[in-house]
Amino acid sequence: MVGGDRRFKVSKLMAYILRHSPWEFGLEPDEEGFVELADLIRAIKTVYPWVTEEFIKEIVEKDSKGRYEIRGSKIRARYGHSYPVVLKHEEDTESKVLYHGTIRENLKGILKEGIKPMKRQYVHLSLSYEDAYYTGRRHGKDVVVLLIDAECLRRKGYKILKAGKRVRIVKHVPVECISEILD
């Protein structure tokens, strides 16, 4: 069994490498963000020498949000990239309501311009209030959760993509698709 603390630390490093800085570790992602699993393991071993392929596969399998994907001998982050990637995710045509957690100080800008991806390619949305709340907590203590009308997004021509088990992504959330602010 993989220890939770070790798994958490390695998963954070994997997210950093795969989402933001593969080149810093000598990796060259393809257009979809995939790198060779063996190369990722070598990169991670420079920080955590005890890491094995089984350990990485266990992280991928047990990740509750489905952050990572292994396809053949390659691995990628499924969402959250700060560099351009082509994500060929399935469209979510069924969700009616989605959630976005943020800190209160961001509300003024959001209510003026909608939710923008900022330094990422997509806005991250959650299937549950709880997930959105905890995502918002990473940015501060005064969290608000925005209720997003998924049908409104679709009517406006936005595609909602299934990026992970409980995560959806969209290019932008216009103000008029924010249906409620939950404290």
Curated annotation (Swiss-Prot):
Highest classification ranks of the organism: Archaea, Methanobacteriati, Methanobacteriota, Thermococci, Thermococcales
Family: Belongs to the KptA/TPT1 family.
Top-level lineage group: Archaea
EC numbers, comma separated: 2.7.1.-
Any coiled-coil regions, as ranges: none
NCBIfam families per the UniProt record, alphabetical: PRK00819.1-2 (NF002013)
GO terms for MF: NAD+ poly-ADP-ribosyltransferase activity; tRNA 2'-phosphotransferase activity
Gene Ontology BP annotations: tRNA splicing, via endonucleolytic cleavage and ligation
PANTHER family for the chain: PUTATIVE PHOSPHOTRANSFERASE (PTHR12684), TRNA 2'-PHOSPHOTRANSFERASE 1 (PTHR12684:SF2)
Protein name: Probable RNA 2'-phosphotransferase
Gene3D superfamilies referenced in this protein's UniProt entry, alphabetically: 3.20.170.30, RNA 2'-phosphotransferase, Tpt1/KptA family, N-terminal domain
Native source organism of the sequence: Pyrococcus furiosus (strain ATCC 43587 / DSM 3638 / JCM 8422 / Vc1)
Function of the molecule: Removes the 2'-phosphate from RNA via an intermediate in which the phosphate is ADP-ribosylated by NAD followed by a presumed transesterification to release the RNA and generate ADP-ribose 1''-2''-cyclic phosphate (APPR>P). May function as an ADP-ribosylase.
Keywords: NAD, Transferase
